[in-house]
């Protein structure tokens, strides 16, 4: 599943993003944030974190530095 999501993000960065320009108000960009979130947290939680980030990325947002939260250790 991660491979499919990474392929979709790569397609977006290569084909769609150049047409839209640099509009993200955050660092790292939303697509980079999504890639890191999926890489560190897995497909389900990473997609959830990326969707939350996309909801915060709008013209009325102050933006700024918003790093992917570190993975929490699993309870045993």
UniProtKB/Swiss-Prot annotation:
Its main location: membrane. Keywords: Cell inner membrane, Cell membrane, Membrane. GO terms for cellular component: plasma membrane. This is Putative membrane protein insertion efficiency factor. Belongs to the UPF0161 family. It is a peripheral membrane protein. It is found in: Cell inner membrane. Could be involved in insertion of integral membrane proteins into the membrane. It comes from the Bacteria. It holds the Pfam family YidD. It comes from Paraburkholderia phymatum (strain DSM 17167 / CIP 108236 / LMG 21445 / STM815) (Burkholderia phymatum). PANTHER family: MEMBRANE PROTEIN INSERTION EFFICIENCY FACTOR-RELATED.
């Amino acid at each position: 599943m991660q491979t499919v999501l990474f392929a979709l993000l790569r397609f977006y960065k290569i084909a769609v993003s150049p047409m839209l320009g640099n509009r993200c108000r955050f660092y790292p960009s939303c697509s980079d944030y999504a890639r890191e979130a999926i890489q560190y947290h897995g497909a389900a939680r990473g997609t959830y974190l990326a969707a939350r980030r996309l909801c915060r990325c709008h013209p009325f947002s102050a933006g700024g530095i918003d790093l992917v939260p570190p993975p929490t250790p699993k309870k045993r």
